[in-house]
Amino acid sequence: MKDAEDALPARIPIFPLSGVLLLPDAKLPLNIFEPRYLDMVRDAMAGDRVIGMIQPRPKTSPGLARSPSLLAEVEKPAVYGIGGAGRITAFEETKDNRFEITLTGLSRFAIIEELAVTTRYRQVMADWDRFAGDRWAEEEATGVDRSRLLTALRAYLELARIPAEWETIAKAETSSLITSLAMICPFGPSEKQALLEAHDLFERSRIMTALVEMSLLHRASGGGEDDDDDGDHRIH
């Protein structure tokens, strides 16, 4: 990932997907079935294979009338200014004409501007300079309180009834563990965005620990399941 062949393009397609983030070196499997994103993957495969994952911003309170502006927001939602880009490193076309792909994280990016395009999918000009360290430096886990994080995580997963392979977790490098948890744990979009935008591994670990501990307090006080936890999750 650190070689010159991984130079990143100024113009990239974006795939808005709530609750999903892609961090450098991480693997993100995706099931592509919507026509515009099938187009996006075909075009990416014919080019540099780079796709930018980005979250839609939380919707404003909907009005009673479905105005043209609201309809446009559904079709083309406002997105956060920062996302994570990856390169397609695995591709398979299924018998029912879906694409099953894997993105390997390259770098975060900031949107300079969204382009007026004729493609059905959206494209942006990306600024990579702000996150140059994503590509050229190996992050160290200096200062990370791994013990505190894992203690809170174990209680959180048991309470949420999320299975975890603790033997694998115990052996994982701290940097890989934090990256995996940030991507897999069922936090809400704003919390996921905070994890994505964290300056470094230490800051991301502090945010992760705080989120897990706050969720524990919420559940322990009778708050029940988190509103955004509506999927099947496994930590490994």
Which residues does each predicted region cover?
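Positively charged
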Residues: M1-E165, S190, L201-R204, A210-H236
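Core structural elements
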Residues: I169-F187
